A protein has these predicted regions:
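Cleavable N-terminal export/targeting peptides
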Residues: 1-25
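Generic detector of contiguous secondary-structure segments
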Residues: 15, 54-59, 81, 138-147
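Short N-terminal segments immediately surrounding and downstream of signal-peptide cleavage
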Residues: 20-39
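Gram-negative (and chloroplast) outer-membrane scaffold detector with strong preference
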Residues: 24, 32, 55-125, 186-191
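Hydrophobic, lipid-facing positions within transmembrane beta-strands of outer-membrane proteins
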Residues: 26, 48-54, 91-95, 112, ...
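Flexible, solvent-exposed loop segments that connect beta-strands
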Residues: 34-44, 74-90, 118-137, 164-183
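Predominantly the C-terminal beta-signal and adjacent terminal strand-loop region
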Residues: 65-80, 141-191
Length: 191
């Protein structure tokens, strides 16, 4: 009888603490991008776009979390060249490394997120130029912070693209070295 009661108590304890001891959680996320483009001699303004995707948050010791994410991320910019705009939709993989202090009700954290992506579509006035001279491979790093509250996660991050938007070509010299950069705000829900 004692063994049965001990086994039942252990089973009930495992049910109540199972969520905290799990290896990780799947989640969905979405948010807004406030992107601009750096081009030599051409002024660009921020353009608001969006991103959405799937994520998995792995819990590690000492307050660390690793959060691989697959997302569709639309980046763009408005140029002061007679109302010219340009957007590229990237399929990106991001490996976010987070460190924060668990304060029971919430967890503030710092975030470093290297990413790599592939441009799958493009729109706007520079679309024809991107089709011919565009560099579909994009990569960079994001740095920011966030807050976990229950199953929700809010993250603000500044992203630097290291890859050029256009391939180096002398016929399109104004766009050589053009890169996206900007702020992303994301809200995630983990199951």
């Amino acid at each position: 009888m004692k063994k049965f009661i001990a086994a039942a108590a252990l089973f009930l304890m495992s049910l109540s603490f199972g969520d905290k001891l799990s290896a990780g959680n799947f989640g969905i996320l979405g948010g807004a991008n406030f992107c601009t483009t750096s081009m030599a001699g051409i002024k660009s303004e921020s353009m608001t776009q969006w991103h959405a995707g799937l994520s998995y948050k792995m819990n590690l010791p000492l307050g660390f979390h690793i959060q691989p994410t697959l997302l569709y991320n639309v980046k763009g910019s408005d140029f002061n060249l007679s109302e010219t705009d340009f957007t590229v939709g990237y399929l990106e993989f991001m490996a976010s490394v987070q460190w924060g202090i668990d304060l029971i009700l919430f967890r503030p954290f710092l975030d470093v997120s290297p990413y790599v992506g592939y441009g799958v579509n493009h729109e706007g006035d520079l679309s024809v130029a991107w089709k011919e001279f565009g560099n579909p491979l994009g990569y960079g790093v994001g740095v920011g912070g966030g807050l976990d509250i229950w199953r929700f996660q809010l993250v603000a991050r500044y992203n630097w693209d290291f890859g050029q938007i256009f391939k180096p070509d002398q016929s399109v010299s104004p766009v050589i070295g053009a890169r996206f950069r900007g702020v992303t705000l994301s809200l995630a829900y983990f199951f």
